[in-house]
């Protein structure tokens, strides 16, 4: 039992407040920069008081983008959403069916196949990414949604998590389904899926954020500005050489990019937390 000491309470709350301040201060600076005009954002030191140009900056990047040959930011956001949602649905579908087959079907070398999937976690991304790009290029899938999403739909981690959960389900459920004459897919649809809802919610949130925050993969696969994603697009807004970066518009784009993941987390936070807790049981 932890003693309720006043000094310990003050210390822990102080550290909590400091941690929150460290995390939120860069976001506040980005928000302030997004509200300033082109002149004020380059003042040294930059003011920490919000300006009045937030909506104007958002409107500019939303319709026109930033820089030369830049796509409208709404199109980048749409591409990011399509990519994140497709990866999420595909990853959950592939992982659930793979884990279901490994746990409930009896076929030769099924455990070997699982460990072959699992061992891919030991390979760094840098080792896997360039052979994957070569495959996508040979399949003529560069500059396409298929090239953006299909290679990221397989997940050893998600397959492992679903496998561990399925192994906790009692064998009596399988026997009851067999007695009722249920097919494997009916057993999956009517019994396994409802029992997996909390795990699905947790994995949906994690995978959506993973897909939304993809940076390196879109840079390697996409050269068409109209297929660019928001995260990679922000990097393209930063001028190189003698160009001048419109930091107020870049920060406005960053704030817009934060909205979808935050909405997903807030909308599914209860199911997300419950899924994480259930996965540890």
Swiss-Prot record:
Superkingdom of source: Bacteria
PROSITE patterns, alphabetically?
Answer: ABC_TM1 (PS50928)
Q: Which coarse location class describes where this protein primarily resides?
A: membrane
Q: Which GO terms describe its biological process?
A: transmembrane transport
Instruction: Report the GO terms under cellular component.
Output: plasma membrane
Q: What residue ranges are annotated as transmembrane?
A: 16-36, 85-105, 113-133, 142-162, 202-222, 247-267
Instruction: Report the coiled-coil segments.
Output: none
Please name the CDD domains in this protein's record: TM_PBP2
- Report domain ABC transmembrane type-1 positions: 77-268
Q: How does it sit in the membrane?
A: Multi-pass membrane protein
Q: Is DNA damage found in the keyword set?
A: no
| Keywords annotated in UniProt | Cell inner membrane, Cell membrane, Membrane, Transmembrane, Transmembrane helix, Transport
What is the annotated localization of this protein?
Cell inner membrane
| InterPro entries linked to this entry | MetI-like, MetI-like_sf
Q: Does the keyword Manganese apply?
A: no
- Report the sequence similarity comment from the record: Belongs to the binding-protein-dependent transport system permease family. UgpAE subfamily.
Oligomer status and interactors: The complex is composed of two ATP-binding proteins (UgpC), two transmembrane proteins (UgpA and UgpE) and a solute-binding protein (UgpB).
What PANTHER family does the entry give? ABC TRANSPORTER PERMEASE PROTEIN MG189-RELATED-RELATED (PTHR43744), SN-GLYCEROL-3-PHOSPHATE TRANSPORT SYSTEM PERMEASE PROTEIN UGPE (PTHR43744:SF8)
Functionally, this protein is described as follows: Part of the ABC transporter complex UgpBAEC involved in sn-glycerol-3-phosphate (G3P) import. Probably responsible for the translocation of the substrate across the membrane.
- Name by which UniProt lists this protein: sn-glycerol-3-phosphate transport system permease protein UgpE
Q: In which organism is this protein found?
A: Salmonella typhi
